[in-house]
């Protein structure tokens, strides 16, 4: 069974889904030096924006096949280094659509009710 490291907090439902097909270890807040030490034993890495996956981490990843980003961007992953090593980098670009829509509506309501002006007074 493949091993997946979840290095940033994700919802328990995501961990439950991963656990159906892999052995999942949740170790959040690992410093880069520690991640370099533990990454060789994992086939997959699940991150959010907190974990920076640099060239050193990718080079240490002897079994890694995939890096999954729970969120929109992959700017915290050295994608060229991962690609050279044959590691697939994926993200979930539609993961924040509801939150973004809610925020946009809240901002529109705030402007229509003059909340910023009231806050300044």
Name every feature range the model reports, one short phrase each:
Residues 1-92:
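An N-terminal-biased, well-structured beta-alpha scaffold segment characteristic
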Residues 85, 93-121:
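Phosphate-binding beta-alpha-beta segment of Rossmann-like dinucleotide-binding domains, i.e.
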């Amino acid at each position: 069974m493949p091993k997946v490291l979840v290095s940033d907090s994700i919802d328990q439902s995501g961990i439950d889904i991963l656990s159906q097909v892999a052995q999942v270890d949740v170790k959040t807040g690992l410093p880069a030096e520690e991640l370099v030490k533990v990454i060789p034993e994992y086939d997959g890495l699940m991150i959010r924006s907190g974990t920076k996956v640099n060239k050193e981490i990718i080079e240490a990843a002897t079994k890694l096949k995939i890096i999954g980003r729970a969120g929109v961007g992959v700017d915290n992953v050295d994608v060229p280094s991962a690609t050279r090593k044959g590691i697939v980098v994926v993200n979930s670009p539609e993961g924040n659509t509801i939150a973004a829509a809610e925020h946009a509506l809240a901002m529109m309501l705030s402007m229509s009710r003059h909340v910023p002006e009231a806050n300044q007074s």
